[in-house]
């Protein structure tokens, strides 16, 4: 029987989780035994592509190593390498392909996936994320906002009553979102959202 997973396709790191027998979300580690996978792609040749920590080792040393492409999702952007030019969607497909492969080696066949995106992602960026996942061989059940996913998880884990409006901040490696949310009967109502697609931890690191 196939499994349902959740994917955080992040700007700097990505992760996969699934519900265990008790209904608790647990991280599925990658082939390297890591809980998170660096969202970095290296084109070593026309046939050889590295993803994750192996690619990150060469970050900044060559134009063939690409990171933070999530920030350009939905835009007409191409990253030039010695082995071709690649869109953010194509690069995301490569990362998602590794996540799928590594996860299936541990839990078996994946039936469907829920993929999170920044709350301020444009419709084009959401569509590109959906296409990237599908091209990686994933059946996408839902695309949901990252603050919404965080609120659902916190509500379930803490047992707190979140029926009154709460503020959820999502400061990631490359994006910053804020959402005003209510949770009632496991249903999330998003009252309002805003954010910056070009502000995150990576920018603080450069300062």
Question: Where is each model-derived feature located?
Answer:
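Oxyanion-binding/catalytic loops of NTP- or PPi-dependent enzymes
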Residues: 1-72, 79-85, 103-207
């Amino acid at each position: 029987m196939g499994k349902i997973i959740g994917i955080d396709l992040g700007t700097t790191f990505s992760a996969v989780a699934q519900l265990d027998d008790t209904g608790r979300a647990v991280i599925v580690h990658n082939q390297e035994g890591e809980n998170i996978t660096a969202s970095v792609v290296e084109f070593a040749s026309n046939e050889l592509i590295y993803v994750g920590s192996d690619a990150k080792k060469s970050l900044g040393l060559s134009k063939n190593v690409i990171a933070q492409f999530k920030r350009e999702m939905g835009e007409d952007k191409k990253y030039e390498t010695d082995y071709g030019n690649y869109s953010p969607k194509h690069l995301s497909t490569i990362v998602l392909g590794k996540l799928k492969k590594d996860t299936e080696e541990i839990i078996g066949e994946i039936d469907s996936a829920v993929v999170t995106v920044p709350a301020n992602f444009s419709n084009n960026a959401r569509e590109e994320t959906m296409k990237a996942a599908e091209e990686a061989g994933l059946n996408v059940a839902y695309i949901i906002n990252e603050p919404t996913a965080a609120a659902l998880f916190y509500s379930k884990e803490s047992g707190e009553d979140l029926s009154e409006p709460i503020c959820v901040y999502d400061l990631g490696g490359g994006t910053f979102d804020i959402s005003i949310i209510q949770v009632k009967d496991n249903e999330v109502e998003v009252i309002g959202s805003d954010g910056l697609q070009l502000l995150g931890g990576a920018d603080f690191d450069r300062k």
